[in-house]
Amino acid sequence: MNRFLPILLISMLAYTAYAAGTVTLTGTCRSNLSNNQSINFSIANSGTESASSVVLQSYYAFSNKLTGTYSTSQISPGHAALFDINSSVGNNTGSFVYYFLVTYQQGTQIFTVVFPCVVQSHGTHPALIGINNVTVNDINSTTAKVNGSIYSFSSNTINGNITLILPPELERNGSRISGFAVNPYQYHNFTLYANLPSQNNTYSGAVALEYSSNGTTYSSVYIIKIIPYSAGQNQLKGYLVQAAIIIVIVIILLLVLRQRILRKKRAVQE
């Protein structure tokens, strides 16, 4: 259970493999703002190949408003790039969800990943609702259903918004709910939808929520992974093949045991 989530630092990992090399990016957000300070965000590459032509776009999650564009020529293995992101929080008080859409090139292929960041403005403001029990399941070969629940620790009814943070190719209608209401000390279930990846890569994303109370904004995030349909099917096929092999072995052992029992009975009768 993600109770309160007083997040000042969020790390999220993106992994891609192309040819013989890999790019493994970890994004780290440190942000406790006052007087409209910038958001400090770093991307480290722990893979074996460079991420080149890196472009970062920053967005406020609940408006999808572009707040800035940044770039660096490459992030080599074992190195990190540091970005100072302009904040649009201003003098507003509370916690706010931003996300950074990062596009990079590995070999001749271009990849896109997202990194969420909870920005604390004028102090730390933990949310009184948490995101829980999130599952991601395929509906068909193109669509995933994201189910979960929200639990309220507040003595008052909370009204807010909830959304998925995803790379653009995974976004679709039904990825956002507005105007949810959670009763005091109760669960509220939600369902969101995402497109499944067309390429055989696993994507990271997030469920984010936001609400306001007495002039202060509160936010929370929950990291998710979306696996391509083919990868999920291949994994299922692998399990089915293993189960079939085990069943065949058991049948063979039972037949051998039966033959031995019959031979013993014949020997006794003779």
Task: Describe each PLM feature range.
Residues 39-47, 146-152:
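Aromatic/hydrophobic beta-strand junction motif of beta-rich domains
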Residues 60-91, 168-198:
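Intrinsically disordered, low-complexity Pro/Gly/Ser/Thr-rich segments with frequent PxxP/GP/PP motifs
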Residues 91-99, 198-205:
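Short glycine/proline/serine/threonine-rich loop/turn segments at secondary-structure transition edges
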